[in-house]
Structure formats: structure tokens, C-alpha cells
From Swiss-Prot:
One of its GO terms (molecular function) is ATP hydrolysis activity. One of its GO terms (cellular component) is cytosol. It comes from Schizosaccharomyces pombe (strain 972 / ATCC 24843) (Fission yeast). Keywords: Cytoplasm, DNA damage, DNA recombination, DNA repair, Meiosis, Nucleus. This is DNA repair protein rlp1. It comes from the Eukaryota. InterPro entries: P-loop_NTPase. The lineage of its organism: Eukaryota, Fungi, Dikarya, Ascomycota, Taphrinomycotina.
Length: 363
């Protein structure tokens, strides 16, 4: 064995070990265990379901898994439904960072405090409008007699109470408008800013152009995404950092497309629309093979369109309650129910249909 063959063999072994290590890390998560089990690069993974069935919520957790796994993996997100929330992704990553670093208590910073105070002020305003405020109702009419020209503010005891209520209202308003980010929230924002690129295409042609076919193409898409995500990139004329695309340091972890069937009825009226979807599938599969990353799409309409030439591995998402949703493999008829909490994602395997075990094995 000469030196060139020896180096090639070492490189091949290191790639196999890194691939096994990556697969081991991926399979530690219950959601990725269902999605990525048995799939290879170049396979299009599609999560189907009705509106508000938890499809986008799944993508939030898949993106958080990549961001937590390594600081060298990038996430490309294409949201053609325009409802992708950066704040929601930051909140999920914020909670995952807290649980991964061994913090037992829930962090009460930022939007958690803001939402809590806003709900308190909203309840107080509603009670005041309905006349059910405890402070007002506690003052009985029999205790004091008011003349026609007097008001409650003219009495010393009621004046002190009114001033106290005013101070409390000012405190609630200041607390609801003030944001106190913690270190976990800042880390989540920093990770999303450095490792995520989010695009909101307005036309189907923009969706096709958002799928990279080379490293140079990925650099162009990443720069366009940063222009859409940050106004400072345009206003302050800050230079784009191309060092993150160094092949030796970073790699594309996954491509997430929210809304595969958004432009279906727009394309349905055009000639050759089936070929357009076939070209989109080819671009997605090519990107998966080129960058060695999974491609996950959401879809709510194309599951019954058998005439479309889209070959993919299908899953069904169904929301059962506010804190859990159901993910089913459409081929094996087996599913898992995921419970979302502050500690992360918990799962409970169960049958997806009332078939017997023998019938399930035949499938």
C-alpha cells in the first residue's frame, strides 16, 4: 500500500466514524428517530397534515436539534407560507438550552415575563370594565355617604388606595414593555443569527431559487436570507462574513421547507405544472445528496394528488391537544405521540390505527 492509498483509507475510515457518530446523535432525539430512520441522503421527507396539525412545530424542533448538536452546522429554512416565527424558534431553543445545561427551574425572562404581565394587565382592565374589580367592590356604599358633588378621590382613605392602584398599573405597564434577556436567550439569538438562514419567497420561482445546487449558490442564498432577516445588513452596510462557509469548519445540517403546496392552485392553471413540481423535487434531492443533509418539507394539500410526480417518504401529523401532537409513518402505519414541555420532547409509542398486530406486520 502506497502513501496515497493509505491516506485515502484513513480518510474513508474517518468519514465512516463521523457518519456513525452523527447518526448516533441524530437518533437520540425521538422526532428524528421516526423521520430519519431508514432514510438516506437524497430522500425527500414530507410531513402531511391539515391546518394547525403541528407541522411547523415539528420543524421548529428539528431546527433546534441541529443548532444544539453542533455550532458548525447550518440550517436553511424556506417558508413559503410566511408564518415562520423567529421568536418562536428562539423561545424553543431557549428552553432547550436551559434543559440541556442542567438548569432545573424555568427561566422567567424576556417574553415569559412580558406575556405574564400583559395577561395580568388585560385581566385587570377587563375586571374594571365589567365592574368586578375587588378594590372597587370592597368599598360598600353603606360605609360612606357621597353627596352629588363629591367623588371617591376626595376621601383620604380612598385617595391612598387610588394612588396605590395607579402605582401598580404603572409598574405592570413598565414591566410588560421592558425586556430582560438572560444569557440563555442571548445564546439562542446568537446561534440563530449565526447558523440559520430564513427565506420568505413570494412566488414559486423564488422557492426554486432558494434551493442551493452548489456551495457558491448556497453563499448567494445565505446572503439574501441575511438581508431579509436583518435590516442592519442593509442600513449599516455591514460586510457579509463568508468564513462560515469554509468546508473544513461548517456544513449544511438540514434544509427545511414550510409549505410545499402553497402555490399549487397558482401553478394548477399553468401548462406543465407537474413537470414544475418534478423539477423542484429533483433540486431538493440533489441538494440532499450534495450537502449530505436531510430535506424535510411540510404539506397540507398534495397528499391526495396522486398524479403529481413527487416521490417522497410521507408522514402524517395530527394535533391531539395543546401540548402534544401525533406523528405517523404513512408506510408502516406506526406512530408516536410527542409531548412538548420545558424539559424537551417526550414520546410514547402507540398504534396509529385500530388494526390487529398481524395485519400491521403484513403491511
Amino acid at each position: 500500500m502506497n502513501a496515497a492509498e493509505w491516506v485515502a483509507e484513513l480518510k474513508r475510515k474517518s468519514q465512516i466514524e463521523s457518519f456513525k457518530e452523527q447518526k448516533g446523535l441524530v437518533y437520540d432525539d425521538h422526532i428524528e428517530k421516526v423521520l430519519y430512520s431508514g432514510s438516506v441522503n437524497g430522500t425527500l421527507l414530507v410531513i402531511e397534515g391539515n391546518s394547525c396539525s403541528g407541522k411547523t412545530e415539528l420543524l421548529y424542533h428539528l431546527a433546534s436539534n441541529v443548532l444544539l448538536r453542533s455550532s458548525q452546522e447550518l440550517v436553511l429554512i424556506v417558508s413559503s407560507e410566511w408564518d415562520w416565527s423567529i421568536k418562536r424558534l428562539t423561545f424553543i431553543l431557549h428552553e432547550r438550552l436551559i434543559s440541556s445545561r442542567g438548569v432545573s427551574q424555568t427561566c422567567k425572562c424576556n417574553c415569559a415575563v412580558k406575556l405574564e404581565n400583559e395577561s395580568t394587565v388585560h385581566l385587570q382592565n377587563a375586571a374594571r370594565e365589567d365592574g368586578t374589580d375587588e378594590d372597587i367592590n370592597s368599598n360598600s356604599v353603606n360605609d360612606v355617604s357621597l353627596s352629588s358633588g363629591e367623588t371617591m378621590l376626595q376621601f383620604p382613605e380612598h385617595e391612598e388606595q387610588h394612588e396605590c392602584n395607579r402605582e401598580m398599573e404603572q409598574l405592570y405597564e413598565s414591566a410588560s414593555s421592558t425586556v430582560y434577556p438572560c444569557s440563555f436567550w442571548e445564546d439562542a439569538e446568537r446561534k440563530i443569527d449565526a447558523q440559520c438562514a430564513i427565506l420568505w419567497p413570494m412566488e414559486f420561482s423564488g422557492v426554486v431559487e432558494s434551493i442551493p445546487q452548489s456551495t457558491k449558490d448556497l453563499l448567494r442564498i445565505w446572503k439574501e436570507a441575511k438581508i431579509q432577516m436583518h435590516e442592519d445588513f442593509r442600513c449599516n452596510k455591514t460586510e457579509f462574513n463568508e468564513a462560515c462557509f469554509d468546508a473544513s469548519s461548517s456544513r449544511l445540517g438540514c434544509i427545511l421547507m414550510d409549505g410545499l403546496s402553497t402555490f399549487y392552485w397558482q401553478l394548477r392553471l399553468e401548462r406543465g405544472y407537474t413537470q414544475v413540481y418534478a423539477d423542484l423535487q429533483n433540486r431538493l434531492c440533489t441538494s440532499s445528496k450534495l450537502f449530505g443533509c436531510p430535506v424535510v418539507c411540510t404539506n397540507w394539500l398534495l397528499n391526495n394528488k396522486q398524479h403529481l410526480p413527487i416521490q417522497c417518504k410521507r408522514f402524517r401529523s395530527e394535533r391531539r391537544a395543546n401540548a402534544r401532537f401525533y406523528l405517523e409513518n404513512c408506510v408502516s402505519k406506526l406512530g408516536e405521540t410527542f409531548y412538548l414541555s420545558v424539559k424537551g420532547v417526550q414520546t410514547k409509542t402507540e398504534m396509529a390505527s385500530p388494526y390487529s398486530q398481524q395485519e400491521m406486520e403484513k403491511v
